Amino acid sequence: MIDKVRAFIHRHQLLSEGAAVIVGVSGGPDSLALLHVFLSLRDEWKLQVIAAHVDHMFRGRESEEEMEFVKRFCVERRILCETAQIDVPAFQRSAGLGAQEAARICRYRFFAELMEKHQAGYVAVGHHGDDQVETILMRLVRGSTSKGYAGIPVKRPFHGGYLIRPFLAVSRAEIEAYCRQMGLSPRCDPSNEKDDYTRNRFRHHIVPLLRQENPRLHERFQQYSEMMAEDEQFLEELAADALNKVMEKQHRDAALSIGPFLELPRPLQRRVLQLLLLRLYGGVPPTLTSVHIGHILMLCERGRPSGMIDLPKGLKVIRSYDRCLFTFDAESGEKGYWFELPVPALLPLPNGYAIISEFGEHYPRKQAGNDWFVVDPASVSLPLRVRTRRRGDRMVLKGTGGTKKLKEIFIEAKIPRMERDRWPIVEDADGRILWVPGLKKSAFEAQNRGQARYILLQYQAMNS
């Protein structure tokens, strides 16, 4: 088995000679065999091998015994061993995560700390060929992204180095045979024998049937995984270029231009969405599936100009005319604001703009457009106020004298619904709407009649 693993490491360039390697060791057959293999290769490749074990504190004394077992194993073989006891149940409750995801996050944080401490370039974990088969099958059945269908990667960047999986070349049966041959006595987790978990049901009932058809099943699935990963890498490069052409980044949010997006080939559309979501989630994708991607595509393609769908972890996708907004600001459309507008002042607004107010002795020469408004202090009730829209809002339009609903003004200007709820409206103390900045002026704007004093209002972006 060592020869097969050695060849796999060479073929995928998993390690460099003289490297420091953190080996994750739970005490089970896979990780114990992995540590033993690295021990066998240590002198040949001049490796510094550090064993890393985490007690997740799920099983009390039993977990502590596993930690002591790993320590003894390392002491007997003169392997540096780093251990940690982490209250994963407490972290799980505070973060609202599943047990396995919480344990994985805590474990990998510990690995990252050890990489810094020992200046290690690699973390090796014990996923094997059967894990690959189970993972791909589960994702095919449940639904996943194109990248997810490629299964477990052989090597990926991790904390300035790489996370590697040398055992993807071998099966569970080969690992168990290796343990017997080398006289290793790994600890066995009894939960692996129960059908309570989806992976266990695939392991006990589905994979054995497939292996009857092909005893080298894990090798076929690994070949499939590597081909899919290569295809995905190429398509991701195309998707990254396409994404830059159709996306507008807005702080934690992003907006997609629907027209240019729909001109892309369908395979690129899917991957552009996957890449966009990956960036929005901060590089840690949640449980996203092809179903979610399909829903976003339907939202972009359908004839209706508006709509909204919910994605995991509070992300919303909001269609408004020719834009699709991806936002975590789930409640922004429900929260209004109300500010008094002093003079002079610079009043920052929640939508990223500001209203600048000042006194002027002369009527401004340049106040064309809807980003300026001139107030005659004698003809309005002070103080001025800035607020968000309310049901039934109407204003008297400048030039016509007629009234119009603010809702109609927003619709005619094609302002997305999400932005309407944050759009500023300037009124006087009597509640008369004077100005919808950037969109419409009311009939209450001051005229150039030689008054001694005016209030000048300007609406501009905060970063301008």
From Swiss-Prot:
Keywords assigned: ATP-binding, Cytoplasm, Ligase, Nucleotide-binding, tRNA processing
UniProt protein name: tRNA(Ile)-lysidine synthase
InterPro entries documented for this protein: Lysidine-tRNA-synth_C, Rossmann-like_a/b/a_fold, TilS/TtcA_N, tRNA_Ile_lys_synt, tRNA_Ile_lys_synt_N, tRNA_Ile_lys_synt_subst-bd
Domain comment in the entry: The N-terminal region contains the highly conserved SGGXDS motif, predicted to be a P-loop motif involved in ATP binding.
Protein residues bound to ATP: S26, G27, G28, P29, D30, S31
EC number per UniProt: 6.3.4.19
Function: Ligates lysine onto the cytidine present at position 34 of the AUA codon-specific tRNA(Ile) that contains the anticodon CAU, in an ATP-dependent manner. Cytidine is converted to lysidine, thus changing the amino acid specificity of the tRNA from methionine to isoleucine.
The reaction(s) this protein catalyses: cytidine(34) in tRNA(Ile2) + L-lysine + ATP = lysidine(34) in tRNA(Ile2) + AMP + diphosphate + H(+)
EC main group: ligase
Stored Pfam families: ATP_bind_3, TilS, TilS_C
UniProt-listed HAMAP family: tRNA_Ile_lys_synt
GO-annotated biological processes: tRNA modification
